[in-house]
Amino acid sequence: MTTLFNQPLNVINVGIAMFSDDLKKQHVPVIQLDWTPPGQGNMQVVEALDQLAEKPLAEKIAAANNIALERIIQSHPVLVGYDQAINVVPGMTRTTILHAGPPVSWENMCGAMKGAVTGALVFEGLATDLEDAARLAASGEITFSPCHEHDCVGSMAGVTSASMFMHIVENKTYGNRAFTNLSEQMAKILRMGANDQSVIDRLNWMRDVLGPMLRDAMNIIGEIDLRLMLAQALHMGDECHNRNNAGTTLLIQALTPGLIQAGYPVAQQREVFEFVASSDYFSGPTWMAMCKAALDAAHGIEYSTVVTTMARNGYEFGLRISGLPGQWFTGPAQQVIGPMFAGYKPEDSGLDIGDSAITETYGIGGFAMATAPAIVALVGGTVEEAIDFSRQMREITLGENPNVTIPLLSFMGIPTAIDITRVAGSGILPVINTAIAHKDAGIGMIGAGIVHPPFSCFEKALLTFRDRYFL
């Protein structure tokens, strides 16, 4: 006993963190065990987990989940073209505005989304100015709908209108297509809620110059293998959500022969290359559409508990589950925690927003941060934490994707197929790295960081799944 008290004190604390915090202040080594009971203590969730574990239902769920996992892994998305939304997006009309996240009314839209909507209405010529656009948006004459319900995804506010050029990504394995608009690059842009004349002028140029050049280039090239390019980008230090240095280089490399052969004036070619070089985010939307094409192939499988959508609109966070097609499970959008740009404070930030969490749903972004340790300079945290995120996400997924691997973790495949029962049982929430938009319209991006979905989304999904399938 005397020997015990003469040894250095090493502490593992389970439960309330205040005890470990006090020990840290006294310079005592301490490990805080981040543990929560199954279902975060909600006995309804615990009961539902037990019910779903009973045979023969558990066997049906396992079989369905194997199919979902296989469809995600076997999906082979390729870029096949670019065209205006009105020509390719299902359900698009001249008076339709698509947005990120689950359904949301004009009244409940956050500042960044309202800014993007009003800017898009001016861009489309449906309103004379931003004030007129706000009146029109509130009038009921504009149809608002989630991108995800139109085979689309949209970064940040995700606002997509008829004239905008879209990526066209085809899943060669299963034949479905996915779409997303072009990157405006970074900072003061529509998708972040900015909407002044400089933003509208850029959108006009993208419609009149960039979009047609990309369209004609792809008509020459035919297709670009995005799954292969994604695997290469991760091996080159990207995680393909918020760090895209390698991916953008690879994508413009593949596009360049077509852009040159398309026959546009040298001055316009230079404008396009300078635009791409202005930010590494050019390939960001490309990966989003790729992930969407793969995950849609796994949506609508009876008995499957796999998450096929995670999306946010600055007001709510929403999930969709393979075995419960057509339903959204929502909870309040969360505060993103991370470094702010100079001059901004956390209280300036809007809540979590964007469809870009489709990347994490697929297994990249926050799930693959071990491939991109340099990203911590943007989103905060340490290299060790970034690596641990990739390990931890394997605990809430059904498998690994051997087509897309993480060199630092002995070429482990990216964690693939989030399972609501594993999230509910472990209490581990998916990790998302993301940009931060200002809470007010008209300003734009003010930082980046880490965020998690609210547990209530998974709770609602699990209980609804139990009610649907447990007989």
Where are these regions (language model features)?
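Anaerobic metallocofactor- and corrinoid-dependent redox/one-carbon enzyme cores
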Residues: T2-L471
